[in-house]
């Protein structure tokens, strides 16, 4: 053998190399021979690789290696046969065999007529490379085993994968569909059913550590799953697993519970595929982000190595592009596309590209997908999908919940919304409705009243009898995670983060310096827009999910981050928002009657202001300024006027907000900037002078205001409220930390993970983006929860295999809109009598059920899921997520259920390779 051979480059990141020392100048001869004997390469390679050498060197003594070299791979040996083979005394060889079995170099079974124990030198994968990784304590002591398993499950296949026929040729693992996805398949055969295998090995099951999860975690590419108990050994393998401290026996009901939880988490069922159609020894529940078996098909783009006999198919008439099937598809076969016809496609629904396959094509590394774990999580075709889902910062499945609402399935609609937005009742009142701005129906007449429908659905959360409390879906068999996580700030970002961490099985603790949750939702948004009991109701659900709230605690003042670390907190999500205001830097602004908008709104929302006398001048033109003006009007101020730099067309406040302010009695003057505040002899505000603003932005759209100082306007005032920006009040929160601050004192962080320069501190919401909308903060909180979950789980990557959140809207100018109903947009009733009687109560009523039915019928149904059959591996997970019965498995590839023994792999490969070569030569497909 060539020493220090370089191996093969697979264009994947080289992980675990730090665990592989250089080969010694004089390697142990017995170990070198063992490497030659056991490395089990499909294609000859004569290099001695470091991870192979050191794994065997750490696992075996020279004497053990010599015994192993005498054993033929996969041939069983009874104890008398081993005595004869080695010439060793029975007691001595039996102890050695048991020691090697405990390490993982050997396995054993009783598969003979006499039920005598027999030992087997297994192949590496599935086999000894896995066994070496299945006992966590052993793996942590010998991390080189992780690298060995990672490479042994990849390197030998690199050149053979294009020649693997349907069924897998006795190599590795085989996808077995979700049982209920094929219940009705009359053409199915027994080996395609999990129940068949559970019946075959009835009463002999053991749950064990997932070697793939454990291996990846040791090398820093874990998926944040708890590795324990996801793999189910069956038959004699169950005894082996238990007796060698790799697992524990489980009942059939416990097996069902593991399978159900795996499906809830989106894990793929696989069975071993090296013993033909009459034997398996394990059912695995695999996460594609770490699974080496699924990697064989995904990395090399050779699905024959994984797929079942089934292919997922979408009924487009039923599909509403909710994206649930797309999110769970391990192969990236399902992606969101469009249902509407396209002008570019000749008035037809567009055709979508299919993955090229090696069946009739020359195949080398240029055809591989080394970034498959991320690429498979891009959920939209480049040509786009429903604009509403794309435009929403949280990417809520708008089309899906509209359809559920249309069918009267309100609980399911609420559950679907909460997959991306845990505060739908709040957003139904205060969202800035970017989904409606993007709605294709707006090209016909008026956008669908999406937010009003959401508000109707989310009203269920305000009643304990109908509210939706999501179940915990956690990737651990322990019932949940015990890592302590602190969320600092109970605004929309913090609440969102708490919700999704609780849903994942954590018990996050939310620290809030105020006495009530909600942040600016509570202390900034007027109660006539958002009643505070709505906030309390949605927070109560998060509390019921397991989150703890500690009010009146300011982190940095009452308790420091280091003190929280000493209490056992492993990660922090800082989402304190922009709680301070900004002044204009003009004379007179330090007077008592000059305040900033956030302080004014906090006082009003805290109930500390009963009435406002005199004239109120508001400086600013955004939605917050509108809120100030409307509050002032409702508090009785005799004259309320807003002054802003922008023209009416440039005003940040929406047209609807401006209209409502005017209806409340506010006046709006555009094109003016503050110059000076005038005070009377007592030092109280008596007026303010403005100067004409001639330009707000430069040619590149950057703020660069210019003024005509000769064009002045003085107005009387009894108070001035500055609403020209907000600031972050850090206090001592970050004292001693490595968190870096940028423009506007906002925290700097990774744009995908929200991790700061202090690894255990994550940020989100306004402290990261600057002042924005609630839905932006909600989206950020969700992503932070993903990152924090990964961060606190040992050895996990924050980035690999996570949803890329890359959505593209279809081209609305390209869609064919020739036939549609002429129903006008429904409008929520405004109760003016209630508004007069209680000006600080909500007065815009919720849609009626009839209005919801009428409005949801206006949705054009832009999107649909598209399945690429060339990528589909037939796992059936998609069918478990669809609420519309729109996706099913069809048994289109019965040949993929051809299971052969490993010993028959070469004839299987050769036969298929010949057919493939002929196709390539003659250009057949």
Predicted features along the sequence, with ranges:
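Ferredoxin-type iron-sulfur electron-transfer modules and their immediate structural context
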Residues: 33-35, 56-57, 196-199, 203-320, ...
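A Rossmann-like FAD-binding core segment of flavoenzymes
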Residues: 533-582, 595-612, 634-744
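Short amphipathic alpha-helical interaction segments
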Residues: 86-102
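Short, amphipathic alpha-helical interaction segments positioned at domain boundaries
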Residues: 115-154
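Short acidic, hydrophobic short linear motifs in intrinsically disordered regions
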Residues: 74-86
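Glycine-rich dinucleotide-binding loop and its adjacent helix/turn
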Residues: 457-478, 504, 537-557, 581-635, ...
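A short, conserved structural fragment
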Residues: 101-112, 334-335, 887
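Beta1-alpha1 glycine-rich phosphate/pyrophosphate-binding loop at the start
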Residues: 396-399, 405-406, 447-451, 487-555, ...
